[in-house]
């Protein structure tokens, strides 16, 4: 009966916060009015707003209404868009946080909230829901519940990670009760101005880790006691006895909480040492033990985890190579140079391979000749330059591409309008070899152009020379042909000889390239 009275007082104090939650539920029903069942819930919300007596039965009806809203939204998620689902989840999460903040101010109200949530969850899961929908509803109700495991997910300094956080949950509830007692004490002595300022600081302590919650609450409580000591004349006579009992009770609660924290930490330290003792020797484990010992010796100094992890890394880093005198880092060592000849002059690179012949089998003109090699150095200079030459690299010119020379115009001028014929030379004599498959010369009358003119001139010259030789009787012919009798040739014989000579000239002209178009 006493607990229910305290709950009713708390609900009356949180009237504005409850009205805000009801307006959010009403707005959520309006945004999703197309879903079946939300209109009835909206009517229930309006009836809850009209009731001014905020009691424990009213609070249970209120929690059941919110649970029904969650059930309808999860059952009808297929009818909603992704944006609507995100918006609904955001509003529901805000509603859950506000309800839990109200309930955590009173341990009986918090217990009643948990019982009502479990009851509603069991009733709703019995309805027509699929397996996925039941899992989704469980997730929604899990965020709505208060479980001890929620403290195991909080970020705490190693090695203060508590897997089983039931003891911390008890300390957290005890600190909430102490906080409520301090607020009641300040409200009973509201005539003291200094306490009104402290009351705001107490109300600002929210969602803290138990240990930091204790530190903040303990510091504020010391200030409250100082105010009572310094302003004892302002304390009303009717409140002196109750103030004394309340102050003694709060001191005992804070002392027990602090002692329990120390006991939890010592037990955890002992468990960690027992686990480490069973493991094989390891430098990393020894560093963890030393860090744990330092943390327990001085709680004011945090564990320098980053500094301890940086030490083994320093040993693995290779020291940089020392810089030379001019503080310029030396370049990487060059590859070994090619061996030098006896005169210490690097040999010229091998000549590049000849380019392939074009289709007409005529080689392209050779590239320009390379520059002449430098004159040989004196022996003294060669000795002085021999050392730095060993440390330098000789660039190979063989890998460099040859300069491209455009010979298309030149080849066009050489080839002319007619295709050139391939000429083969005898390797022994160096003279051109006549092909057996070449066509015989045609009649002189078939010649045309300049070739026929050259042939006539050659015939005239031959006829003139033969007639002059036969008429004059040159001494060279007599000396060479002493044993032969001098015979005169007829005109037919001379014509046959001239025809044979003209054919030879024609064959010679056809084999040589013509530069006349």
From Swiss-Prot:
Q: What does this protein do?
A: Recruits and activates the Arp2/3 complex, which in turn leads to actin polymerization, promoting Rickettsia motility during infection.
Q: Where do Pro residues bias regions lie?
A: 319-340, 347-378
Q: What is the lineage of its organism?
A: Bacteria, Pseudomonadati, Pseudomonadota, Alphaproteobacteria, Rickettsiales
Protein species of origin = Rickettsia conorii (strain ATCC VR-613 / Malish 7)
Alphabetical keyword list: Actin-binding
Give me the ranges of the annotated region Disordered: 313-441, 461-517
Q: Where in the cell is it found?
A: Cell surface
Q: Does the keyword tRNA-binding apply?
A: no
Cellular component per GO? cell surface
Subunit note: Homodimer.
Query: Listed GO molecular functions?
Result: actin binding
WH2 domain boundaries: 406-423
Determine if Protein biosynthesis is one of this entry's keywords.
Answer: no
UniProt protein name = Arp2/3 complex-activating protein rickA
Q: What is its main location?
A: other
What InterPro entries is this protein classified in? Actin_filament_regulator
Gene3D superfamilies per UniProt: 6.10.280.150
User: Which residue windows does the record flag with biased composition (Low complexity)?
Assistant: 463-479
The record's region (Central and acidic domains) falls at: 444-477
Bias class Polar residues marks the residues at 500-517
């Amino acid at each position: 009966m006493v607990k229910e009275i305290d709950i009713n007082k708390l609900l009356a104090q949180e009237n504005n916060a409850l009205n805000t939650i009801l307006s959010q539920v009403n707005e959520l029903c309006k945004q999703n009015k197309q879903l079946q069942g939300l209109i009835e819930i909206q009517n229930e919300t309006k009836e809850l707003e009209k009731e001014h007596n905020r009691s424990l039965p009213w609070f249970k009806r209120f929690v059941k209404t919110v649970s029904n809203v969650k059930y309808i939204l999860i059952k009808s998620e297929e009818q909603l868009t992704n944006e609507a689902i995100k918006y609904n989840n955001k509003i529901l999460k805000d509603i859950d946080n506000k309800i839990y903040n109200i309930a955590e101010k009173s341990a009986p109200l918090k217990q009643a909230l948990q019982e009502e949530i479990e009851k509603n969850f069991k009733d709703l899961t019995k309805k027509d829901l699929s397996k996925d929908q039941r899992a989704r509803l469980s997730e929604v109700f899990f965020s709505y519940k208060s479980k001890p495991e929620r403290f195991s997910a909080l970020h705490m300094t190693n090695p203060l990670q508590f897997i089983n956080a039931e003891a911390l949950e008890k300390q957290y509830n005890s600190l909430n009760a102490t906080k409520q007692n301090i607020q009641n004490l300040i409200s009973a002595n509201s005539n003291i101005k200094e306490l009104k300022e402290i009351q705001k600081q107490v109300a600002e302590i929210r969602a803290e880790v138990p240990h930091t919650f204790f530190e903040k609450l303990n510091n504020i409580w010391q200030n409250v006691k100082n105010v009572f000591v310094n302003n004892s004349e302002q304390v009303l006579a009717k409140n002196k006895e109750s103030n004394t009992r309340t102050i003694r009770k709060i001191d005992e609660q804070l002392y027990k909480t602090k002692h329990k924290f120390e006991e939890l930490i010592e037990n955890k330290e002992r468990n960690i040492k027992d686990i480490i003792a069973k493991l094989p020797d390891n430098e990393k484990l020894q560093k963890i033990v030393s860090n744990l010992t330092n943390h327990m010796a001085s709680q004011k100094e945090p564990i320098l985890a980053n500094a301890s992890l940086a030490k083994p890394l320093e040993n693995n880093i290779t020291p940089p190579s020392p810089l030379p005198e001019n503080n310029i880092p030396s370049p990487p060592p060059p590859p070994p140079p090619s061996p030098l000849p006896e005169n210490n002059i690097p040999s010229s690179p091998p000549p590049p391979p000849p380019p392939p012949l074009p289709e007409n089998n005529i080689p392209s003109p050779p590239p320009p000749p390379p520059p002449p090699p430098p004159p040989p150095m004196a022996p003294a200079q060669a000795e002085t330059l021999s050392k730095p030459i060993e440390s330098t690299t000789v660039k190979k010119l063989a890998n460099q591409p040859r300069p491209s020379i455009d010979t298309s115009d030149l080849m066009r001028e050489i080839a002319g309008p007619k295709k050139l014929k391939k000429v083969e030379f005898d390797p022994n004599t160096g003279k051109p070899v006549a092909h057996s498959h070449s066509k015989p010369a045609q009649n002189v009358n078939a010649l045309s152009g300049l070739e026929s003119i050259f042939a006539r001139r050659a015939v005239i010259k031959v006829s003139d020379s033969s007639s002059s030789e036969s008429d004059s009787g040159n001494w060279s012919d007599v000396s060479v042909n002493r044993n032969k009798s001098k015979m005169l040739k007829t005109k037919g014989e001379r014509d046959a000889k001239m025809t044979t000579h003209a054919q030879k000239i024609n064959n010679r002209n056809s084999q040589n390239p013509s530069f006349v178009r």
